């Protein structure tokens, strides 16, 4: 039987950036091959650093998919754990080591007997940086294994062990990266009339763009426009010719995201025109679409977990964090949910350390749900 805690600790020590998960893939394949030995209803494919494990059903009417992400983050770990990251500047700070371990545990249980329906276990690379789910879909990595329904989870530090949370609508926001560069004319600080100050123009933009959310977004729907980087100038007595802004747009529907993207671009171009300078606007959303649960499937999943002993089901509000599972759910009906890990530190924090008793709870809950779906 798979040692869940040791498996998680092994994976925790080898975090890798998206599409560079070579050691992770090798470790996963080794475990998967041991679990599937002698199971003639199993097929395995790889796609770059990703893995697909397909269980052929005995009387299939549909394919049920379970997706887990496998990449780490460029973070220096500060947990002090004896099994801390062995890769300098890399850490599983988003719980993907937990996600992988739970998926392996569920695979082990699913292999106990051939399912009626097909089951697909997807070990997806590059959730954090390149929207690996979108890359796999666009490259036809699924082929005829593409699920009819897709499910997945994400750990959540502020939920207690034993708590599962989701809803029948949107769970995660769609996210869009924004880069804006104003190009004016540099000059001496004493002669501003001979220059065209990009810093001033960019400052006007930062204040004016706040009106996009307050005046263009339905307050019931909500959206976020945040700029976390503002770079301009090199010294106190020189007017800079360029100013660079780097930020993010987040919205709970794709229509709202597109509206906000359009308005941010329009405001930037309007400010540039007012200051008689050039502007470059780069909007990059890629595969980070809103994670929109299928209402009927979500209700089914919620009812199932609500009746499970040891599980506290929570009907939760959407989060403005992003997840590339949204792209796959835009192609295939499915559901994502949160799994509580009771950590005082947030996701992406260098001291984030989930409670390991969650592993057995997660495997028991998810595997029982997948067995139900596979038997329908």
UniProtKB/Swiss-Prot annotation:
Pathway: Amino-acid biosynthesis; L-lysine biosynthesis via DAP pathway; LL-2,6-diaminopimelate from (S)-tetrahydrodipicolinate (acetylase route): step 3/3. The keyword Amino-acid biosynthesis applies. Keywords: Amino-acid biosynthesis, Diaminopimelate biosynthesis, Hydrolase, Lysine biosynthesis. GO terms for molecular function: N-acetyldiaminopimelate deacetylase activity. InterPro entries: AcetylDAP_deacetylase (IPR023905), Amidohydrolase (IPR017439), Bact_exopeptidase_dim_dom (IPR036264), Peptidase_M20 (IPR002933), Peptidase_M20_dimer (IPR011650). GO terms for biological process: diaminopimelate biosynthetic process; lysine biosynthetic process via diaminopimelate. The active site is at 69, 128 (proton acceptor). Its EC number is 3.5.1.47. It catalyses: N-acetyl-(2S,6S)-2,6-diaminopimelate + H2O = (2S,6S)-2,6-diaminopimelate + acetate. Pfam families: M20_dimer, Peptidase_M20. Belongs to the peptidase M20A family. N-acetyldiaminopimelate deacetylase subfamily. Catalyzes the conversion of N-acetyl-diaminopimelate to diaminopimelate and acetate. This is N-acetyldiaminopimelate deacetylase.
